[in-house]
């Protein structure tokens, strides 16, 4: 999408240089704003994470004293307040973005409708307006039979574009909904302009004037129809009474040729009255039929209005549910991201601690090994020095005399010496071991 956008604008940059510069500047501002917001969110999350880690470290070696418990409670409240503040800020940002998205969608829809109306041309627009106006026709028979207020109301609808005042049904429905919410106060017009981006404030004011006149004429029409129905019912009752009187009068027979001209004239008058009563009855029936048709049309319009209101409420409920679901999913996603980041940070911290411990253990073993090797080398050197000194002490130059092997040793000579008696008493005999044969005579 970005590639297509840049290729399109680069191809036509000479034709739309000013517009492209404006769009490029706006895009750069939005990019910088997103980066700043991302950095701010990361900073807040990092601060919350550091506070959580600090609390975890405090909980490792803790003594259950009142001061320590109070300190831990304050830390937990601080972390909870920070998390709640972060959630509230994000919720407000999401609501603002959703409102901007709705406004943008409404603007796009309004622009699309305008473009479609431009594409259709003036002839199609006139046909559509005539189709709207044709929903409330006023024929000559109706003008002669219906009350003046009803005819005036129908003419008003025909001249102003139907029951929506020339607006489309959705715009008029939103207008009525906002107006009813504010109970007709003038402050509702600004909100209508926000909900209907395709309409200006002047158009909304003109539509409000039309709608006030529409309500006034409609109320007069209802009152007039009610009065008209009452009068017609009274006339109908009078005609029925007259008809009953006429029916009770016997019709003239052909066998009575001797009746006087005065009686025949009176009979003709009665017949004429009966015919006029029948014509009035037919006229009343036709008027009642037209009134019934009007009632049916009004009831149909009310049903359609109620159905549109119901659909609008359902749409609002669906949008509200969708919004809540989206916010909940976004909150869960952020919470999951924070949890994953915390777990990753904890794993990195644990891995770093384990790595440092292993390195320290290996370094200690290496030091012990080096010390042991040095001790062995020193011991070996010391032993070598002692041997050297010992060799220096006992070393003597002796001439070689192989015959000394056959000579008796000094010890042997001392043993073989004959020692005479030293006293007058007898000498004890001291036994000696036998001399080996190979030593005898030496």
From Swiss-Prot:
Top-rank lineage group of the source organism: Eukaryota
Coiled coil: 23-116, 217-249, 281-400
Keywords: Coiled coil, Cytoplasm, Cytoskeleton
Localization, UniProt: Cytoplasm, Cytoskeleton, Microtubule organizing center, Centrosome, Centriolar satellite
Biased composition (Basic and acidic residues): 256-268, 294-310
InterPro entries hit by this protein: CCDC148/CCDC112
PANTHER family given in the database record: COILED-COIL DOMAIN-CONTAINING PROTEIN 112, MUTATED IN BLADDER CANCER 1
Protein's recorded name: Coiled-coil domain-containing protein 112
């Amino acid at each position: 999408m970005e590639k297509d956008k840049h290729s399109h604008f680069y191809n036509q940059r000479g034709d739309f240089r000013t517009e492209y510069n404006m769009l490029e500047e706006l895009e750069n501002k939005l990019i910088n704003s997103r980066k700043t917001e991302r950095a701010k969110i990361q900073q807040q999350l990092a601060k919350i994470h550091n506070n959580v880690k600090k609390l975890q470290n405090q909980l490792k070696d803790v003594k259950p004293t009142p001061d320590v418990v109070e300190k831990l409670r304050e830390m937990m409240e601080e972390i909870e307040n920070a998390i709640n503040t972060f959630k509230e800020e994000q919720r407000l940002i999401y609501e603002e973005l959703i409102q901007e998205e709705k406004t943008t969608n409404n603007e796009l829809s309004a622009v699309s409708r305008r473009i479609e109306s431009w594409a259709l041309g003036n002839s199609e627009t006139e046909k559509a307006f005539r189709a709207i106006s044709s929903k409330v026709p006023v024929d000559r028979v109706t003008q002669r039979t219906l009350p003046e207020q009803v005819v005036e109301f129908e003419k008003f609808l025909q001249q102003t574009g139907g029951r929506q005042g020339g607006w489309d049904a959705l715009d008029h429905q939103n207008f009525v909904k906002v107006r009813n919410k504010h109970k007709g106060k003038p402050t509702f017009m600004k909100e209508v302009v926000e909900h209907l981006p395709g309409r200006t404030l002047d158009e909304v004011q003109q539509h409000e004037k039309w709608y006030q006149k529409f309500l006034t004429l409609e109320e007069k029409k209802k009152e007039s129809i009610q009065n008209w129905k009452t009068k017609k019912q009274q006339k109908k009752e009078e005609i029925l009474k007259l008809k009953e009187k006429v029916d009770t009068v016997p019709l003239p027979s052909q066998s009575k040729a001797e009746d006087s001209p005065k009686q025949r004239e009176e009979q003709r008058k009665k017949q004429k009255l009966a015919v006029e009563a029948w014509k009035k009855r037919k006229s009343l029936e036709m008027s009642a039929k037209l009134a019934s048709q009007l009632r049916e049309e009004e009831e149909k319009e009310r049903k359609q209005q109620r159905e549109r209101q119901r659909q609008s409420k359902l749409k609002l409920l669906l949008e509200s549910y969708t919004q809540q679901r989206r916010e909940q999913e976004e909150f869960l996603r952020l919470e999951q991201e924070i949890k994953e980041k915390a777990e990753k940070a904890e794993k990195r911290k644990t891995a770093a601690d384990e790595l440092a411990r292993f390195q320290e253990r290996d370094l200690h073993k290496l030091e012990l090994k080096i010390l042991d090797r040095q001790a062995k080398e020193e011991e070996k050197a010391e032993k070598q020095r002692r041997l050297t000194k010992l060799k220096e002490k006992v070393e003597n130059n002796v001439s070689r005399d192989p015959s000394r092997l056959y000579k008796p040793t000094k010890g042997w000579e001392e043993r073989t010496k004959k020692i005479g008696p030293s006293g007058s008493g007898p000498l004890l005999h001291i036994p000696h071991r036998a001399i080996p044969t190979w030593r005898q005579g030496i």
